[in-house]
């Protein structure tokens, strides 16, 4: 929904993706017991159960970057999984020293591309490659599979951002007549084309088979986009929305778009992402070593070079100080009917509503589709003329039919939401 803005710079995507399964393997006894359910499900070309993909992208400065992510990010994931020879968590792992070396070489090459092309923050980037073999925790039962999807997501995000950033750096700024007057072009390394996906031609002419146009348009795009994606994998072909099916969710996130779960037992919102803002302790620690440009705007919000987000795709002028697309990755195992739904929202929704208010609005809707519309509409109405683009995706999970059971349903935030609507409709309140 466009809201009070002249253009809608938000985009979204949903569908299936061709990568191996990463779900937690079921015990043999349960697998046999659920054999009848499995026969009714769907499998991917590899024989694994299908992996589902959902994403929300909030563009700023234009929609070029968010449209690129909508159309291409899932293909970067598929290509990365293929390059990494990602193994299914449902099959026995294959050990190969040559394969391990190949993965490390791919990762090291990508990091070096960032160091050579952008420099700054990335010259201090550690490690040179991503950890894909070390367990993420002491209780990790399947370290290879877990770390494989982790490394695949990290590589895909940084590779997509490298292609987008390099493509913009090779173009002219419309207001500048030639490359000699362009600080980005004149400061470009001689081997810049070596890191492009089509090095034989300029990045501005690096057409994709999907977009059928140069990445980011014909002139340099200096804006960017946040990204929050969720991948859902099941151990059997039984779909994740079946009440009897367990599932695993992996989220990868940059910026201030958000992903929430609603727990059936108590009706509480469970955030799977954190906002990447300068005021966030982790982000402040990460960036203060490289940037002394934190400022506070008139609303008391900290910004870095005018940006509210410390992680994003694009934003080429801020890459050197660490505004990167390194994703925050989280893995969540779901028992059957443990959660009722998943929500992906842009900051046009979260600017007006708290996490619990968001899930309570969804509880009152009859279908996930109507819930998405009601979320965007409510957020836009409450924000009034100051409303931002608002986008919401609601995904039905196994506990959908029980979404109002725990925590008293949606009554906990009902008064607050009604008060916000009254305030929004009061003309005197809008003038304050």
What does each model-identified segment do?
Residues 1-53, 59-432:
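PP2C/PPM-type serine/threonine phosphatase catalytic core
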């Amino acid at each position: 929904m466009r809201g009070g803005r002249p253009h809608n710079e938000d985009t979204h995507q949903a569908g299936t993706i061709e990568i191996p399964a990463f779900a937690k393997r079921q015990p043999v006894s349960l697998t046999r017991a659920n054999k009848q359910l499995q026969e009714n499900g769907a499998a991917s070309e590899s024989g694994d159960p299908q992996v589902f993909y959902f994403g929300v992208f909030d563009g700023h400065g234009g929609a070029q970057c968010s449209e690129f992510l909508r159309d291409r990010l899932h293909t970067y994931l598929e290509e990365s999984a293929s390059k990494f020879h990602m193994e299914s968590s449902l099959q026995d792992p294959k050990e190969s020293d040559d394969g391990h070396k190949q993965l490390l070489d791919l990762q090291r090459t990508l990091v070096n591309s960032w160091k050579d092309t952008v420099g700054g923050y990335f010259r201090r980037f550690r490690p040179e490659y991503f950890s894909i073999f070390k367990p993420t925790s002491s209780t990790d039962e399947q370290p290879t599979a877990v770390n494989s999807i982790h490394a695949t997501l990290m590589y895909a995000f940084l590779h997509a951002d490298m292609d987008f950033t390099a493509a913009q750096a090779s173009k002219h700024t419309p207001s500048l007549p030639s490359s000699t007057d362009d600080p980005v072009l004149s400061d470009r390394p001689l081997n810049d084309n070596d890191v492009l996906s089509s090095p034989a031609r300029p990045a501005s002419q690096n057409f994709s088979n999907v977009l059928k146009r140069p990445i980011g348009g014909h002139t340099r795009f200096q804006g960017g986009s946040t990204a929050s994606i969720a991948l859902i994998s099941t151990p059997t072909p039984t779909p994740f929305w079946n009440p009897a099916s367990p599932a695993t969710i992996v989220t990868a996130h940059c910026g201030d778009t958000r992903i929430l779960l609603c727990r059936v037992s108590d009706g509480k919102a469970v955030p799977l992402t954190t906002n990447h803002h300068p005021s966030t302790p982790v982000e402040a620690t990460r960036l203060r070593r490289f940037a002394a440009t934190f400022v506070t705007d008139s609303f008391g919000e900290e910004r870095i070079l005018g940006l509210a987000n410390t992680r994003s795709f694009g934003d080429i002028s801020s890459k050197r100080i660490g505004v990167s697309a390194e994703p925050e990755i989280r893995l969540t195992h779901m028992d059957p009917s443990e959660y009722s739904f998943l929500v992906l929202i842009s900051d046009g929704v979260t600017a007006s509503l708290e996490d619990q208010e968001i899930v309570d609005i969804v509880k009152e809707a009859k279908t996930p589709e109507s819930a998405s519309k009601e979320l965007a509409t409510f957020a836009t109405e409450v924000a009034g003329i100051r409303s931002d683009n608002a986008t919401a995706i609601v995904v039905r999970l196994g506990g959908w039919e029980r979404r109002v059971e725990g925590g008293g349903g949606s009554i906990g935030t009902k008064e607050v939401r009604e008060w916000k609507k009254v305030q929004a409709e009061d003309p005197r309140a809008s003038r304050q």
